Design a protein with these regions (language model features):
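Conserved TIR/SEFIR loop-to-helix hotspot centered on a Trp-containing motif
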Residues: 108
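Nucleotide and nucleotide-moiety/phosphate-recognizing core
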Residues: 2-105, 115-119, 123-129, 136-141, ...
């Protein structure tokens, strides 16, 4: 069994914000494949899908971003899921809007939701699907940036990023992290 966790903030007022790209991807995964009814479990909205014969829980913590680990840690322990089987989808300001980067592990990179997961999971060794939300405008704070909706002009990139991430998550669930990273990470241009 695997957990696929999308990070975000609960509530209508946060629904379309950049910080909620993880929730948007989870919803798009659920819209693309048959799934069970959503239910509340360990302070998260949870449903299950089946990928390649394996049960996968789709998870949207309802604790607010900075406390996400308080939901994910207990879910992981309840279902006896190894950290390497907890796939986390979240926003990344260091990537251009809609761009995806998959990593098998790593530090929080200053992301408070990831800091909370690391604290409650007990390790940095869990897979990440980072979705770009771009850098804030010079006059904006980081908080203003992540809690603002995507601009109208960026919607095409956002929707493509969500679609690409859905494909990457489902594909990686089928082929495993190493092959998934090779297949779905952006290809680097050779150095000249």
């Amino acid at each position: 069994m695997k957990l696929v966790v999308g990070l975000g903030n609960p509530g209508k007022q946060y629904e379309k914000t950049k910080h909620n790209i993880g929730f948007m991807v989870i919803d798009a995964i659920a819209d693309s494949v048959p799934h069970t009814t959503w239910s509340e479990e360990q302070r998260a909205e949870v449903c299950s899908i089946t990928v390649d014969g394996e049960k996968v829980l789709l998870v949207k913590p309802q604790t607010f971003m900075n406390l996400s680990g308080e939901s994910v840690g207990p879910l992981m322990r309840y279902y006896k899921i190894d950290p390497s089987d907890v796939y986390c989808i979240y926003d990344d300001m260091d990537l251009p809007i809609g761009k995806l980067r998959i990593r098998p592990n790593g530090s929080s990179g200053g992301h408070n939701g990831i800091k909370s997961l690391i604290s409650h999971i007990g390790t940095e060794n869990f897979p990440r699907f980072r979705v770009g939300i771009g850098r804030p405008l010079p006059q904006w704070t980081v908080i203003d940036h992540v809690l603002a909706p995507f601009s109208e002009e960026s919607q095409e990139k956002v929707q493509k990023g969500i679609k690409d991430t859905v494909k990457a998550v489902l594909g990686t669930l089928e082929v495993g992290m190493d092959k998934g990273m090779n297949q779905f990470n952006p290809k680097r241009r050779p150095q000249r």
